[in-house]
A protein has these predicted regions:
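Catalytic center-proximal scaffold of phosphoryl-transfer enzymes
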Residues: 1-344
Length: 344
């Protein structure tokens, strides 16, 4: 297949710059280039299926080898899904590696529904004892590995329960709960600032953070808020995740929040405001693949355009071995050299 030279530019504009195809179509008309949005959409789908899917699948296999993962999800509208109305919500899942000082892996995945089984299926194969940082969505309960709640979400619920003007009223239960969370985040920041090893962090967690978490649990047991109040909502949220609160202390590589996942979803949510929907399932799947390549490039300090061009010049296929795909990963020395050449 001969790739059109505008393909890389079209991908960059849509997935890195959040410029939808209909606006690109109008922009191309100015210099006298005639490329319609249907043609561009077909380029993206065909190239994603033929050349980018093998490296996407390689990233997926590598992600499942990690022991610290993070997950989040956000809605997407796909107009043409079998036996579904165009108005039905579909979902984009973000699955990424945790903050464990290994090359980051960021994957986007489309499904028709938000059913928890979708997350479990995508992460099927992770090792027993792996950690998956998730938010409060109950669908993640389908994961058969260790789950951890996000203390940032817990803190957010407690902050919402504090009446306006009472943020420093330390007699208010919600303020007290926030202080426990603040102390844990303070410790985490200090460990990172000192550059402690994971073994050192684990020891400090037992000494510093464990008493705080235990105190938070005792505080939680003593809360009996008015039914239907914001404090009741916060306490219920935390109680439902009580069994995962202590897992933060089990390994120095664990983190307190799922903020890295939320940050990784931001480019997709920004793009969605502009392109609004995917027309077809093939289009949605292709978008997830290209978003993965763009965000993987950015996470490794490579220009997305150069990385996409490097991948498509390499033309990986179904017969490409993992050893060969490794050279196409953005953390490989070969990929970095080739992408930097394209910047010169």
């Amino acid at each position: 297949m001969l790739l059109h030279p505008w393909y890389h530019i079209s991908c960059m504009k849509k997935y890195a710059d959040a410029l939808p195809l209909y606006r690109q179509e109008k922009g191309f008309e100015l210099p006298g280039v005639s490329i319609n949005r249907t043609t561009m959409a077909n380029w993206i789908i065909t190239c994603s299926q033929n050349y980018l899917k093998p490296i996407y699948d390689y990233f997926h296999r590598e992600l499942l080898k990690r022991h610290f993962l993070m997950a989040d999800e956000t809605p997407i509208q796909v107009l043409k899904e079998p036996v579904r109305r165009p108005q039905n919500k579909s979902y984009i899942w973000l699955m990424r590696s945790g903050e464990e000082r290994l090359p980051p892996i960021i994957l986007y995945h489309y499904t028709e529904t938000r059913a928890g089984g979708n997350a479990a299926d995508f992460l099927d194969g992770i090792d027993e004892g792996s950690y998956v940082m998730v938010d409060g969505y109950s669908g993640y309960n389908r994961l058969k590995k260790i789950r951890r709640c996000c203390y940032a979400h817990i803190r957010r619920y407690l902050m919402e329960a504090i009446p306006s003007g009472q943020e420093k009223d330390y007699s208010h239960p919600a303020v007290q709960g926030v202080l426990y969370c603040n102390k844990l985040f303070e410790y985490e920041r200090s460990y990172k600032a000192k550059g402690l090893s994971y073994a050192q962090v684990y020891k400090r967690l037992q000494k510093d953070a464990k008493p705080v978490v235990e105190g938070f649990m005792r505080w939680l047991d003593g809360q009996h808020p008015e039914k239907g109040s914001r404090m009741d909502r916060a306490v219920t949220y935390i109680q439902n995740r009580k069994d995962t609160l202590m897992t933060y202390l089990e390994d120095g590589r664990c983190s307190l929040s799922n903020n890295a996942s939320e940050n990784s979803l931001r480019p997709v949510t920004l793009g969605r405001k502009n392109w609004l929907f995917s027309d077809s399932q093939d289009g949605a799947n292709a978008s997830m693949i290209v978003y993965t390549m763009v965000e993987m490039a950015k996470a490794h300090g490579l220009h997305p355009y150069n990385y996409l061009k490097y991948l498509l010049d390499s033309r990986p296929g179904t017969n490409t071995t993992d050893a060969e795909l490794k050279d196409l990963a953005p953390w490989s020395e070969k990929a970095r050299i080739e992408c930097n050449k394209k910047s010169e």
